[in-house]
C-alpha cells in the first residue's frame, strides 16, 4: 500500500515538474518574441531573455539549444496559430453573405491576437536582414490571404453570385485596405465601420445581377 501511495506521489510530482517546464518554455518563447519584435533578432542576447523571464542563462539552455532554436520555434508556433485561424474558413461550403463577417473576423484576429501582432512586427523588422523572414512575411500576410480570397471568389463566380472576372484581381481590390491598416496598426470604431462599408460596397459592385 505504501509503495502505491509513494508511486502516485511520484507521478504527481513528475506531472507538476512537466507543467512547470512547459510554463517556463512558453514564457521564454513569449518574452523572446516581444524582445525580437521590439529590438530585432540580432540585438537580443540570451541574457536579455533570461532577465525577461527572471531566470538564469542555464534555464534558457535547459529548454533550447540556442537563440536560433528559440526563434525557429516561435516562427513555427505563430505560423500554426495563424493557419489554424485561417483554416476555420470553409471556402468550399461558404455562402455569399459570409464574405463580410469573414473579412472582419480575420482583421480583428490579426490586429488583436498578441502573438500574431508581434509575429507580424518581427517579420517586418527582419525581412530586410533575412531572406527567410521576407518569404514568410509575403506568404503569411500577402500571398496567403490573396490566394484564399481568390479561391473563395472563384467558387462564388462559378455559383453565379459574383460577376465573371479575375478572382485574384477581386482579391487584391478587397484585401488592399485591410493590409494597409494591418501595417499601420491600431483599431478604432470608425476604422472598423469604414472597412465594413468597404466590404459592402465591394459586394455590391461585384454582385451578379
Predicted regions located by residue number:
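C-terminal peripheral helix-coil segments that are non-catalytic and often amphipathic
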Residues: 1-16, 101-108, 154-158, 176-177, ...
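Helix-turn-helix
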Residues: 27, 31-69, 73-74
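Short, charged helix-capping/linker segments at alpha-helix termini
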Residues: 42-43, 159-166
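Hydrophobic alpha-helical connector segments
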Residues: 73, 86-118, 168-174
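Short, basic, alpha-helical segments at the C-terminal edge of helix-turn-helix-like DNA-binding modules
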Residues: 76-83
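Amphipathic alpha-helical segments used for helix-helix packing
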Residues: 98, 111-136, 183
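Amphipathic alpha-helical packing segments from all-alpha helical-bundle domains
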Residues: 112, 131-158
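Short, well-structured alpha-helical segments
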Residues: 150, 164-175, 196
Amino acid at each position: 500500500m505504501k509503495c502505491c501511495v509513494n508511486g502516485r506521489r511520484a507521478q504527481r510530482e513528475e506531472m507538476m515538474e512537466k507543467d512547470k517546464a512547459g510554463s517556463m518554455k512558453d514564457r521564454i518563447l513569449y518574452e523572446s518574441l516581444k524582445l525580437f519584435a521590439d529590438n530585432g533578432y540580432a540585438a537580443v542576447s540570451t541574457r536579455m531573455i533570461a532577465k525577461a523571464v527572471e531566470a538564469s542563462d542555464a534555464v534558457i539552455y535547459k529548454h533550447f539549444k540556442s537563440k536560433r532554436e528559440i526563434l525557429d520555434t516561435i516562427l513555427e508556433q505563430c505560423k500554426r496559430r495563424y493557419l489554424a485561424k485561417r483554416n476555420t474558413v470553409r471556402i468550399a461550403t461558404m455562402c455569399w453573405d459570409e464574405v463580410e463577417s469573414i473579412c472582419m473576423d480575420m482583421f480583428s484576429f490579426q490586429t488583436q491576437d498578441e502573438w500574431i501582432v508581434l509575429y507580424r512586427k518581427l517579420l517586418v523588422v527582419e525581412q530586410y536582414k533575412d531572406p527567410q523572414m521576407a518569404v514568410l512575411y509575403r506568404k503569411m500576410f500577402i500571398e496567403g490571404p490573396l490566394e484564399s480570397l481568390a479561391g473563395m471568389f472563384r467558387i462564388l463566380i462559378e455559383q453565379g453570385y459574383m460577376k465573371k472576372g479575375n478572382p485574384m484581381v477581386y482579391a487584391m481590390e478587397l484585401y488592399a485596405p485591410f493590409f494597409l491598416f494591418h501595417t499601420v496598426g491600431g483599431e478604432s470604431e470608425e476604422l472598423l465601420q469604414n472597412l465594413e462599408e468597404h466590404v459592402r460596397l465591394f459586394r455590391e459592385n461585384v454582385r451578379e445581377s
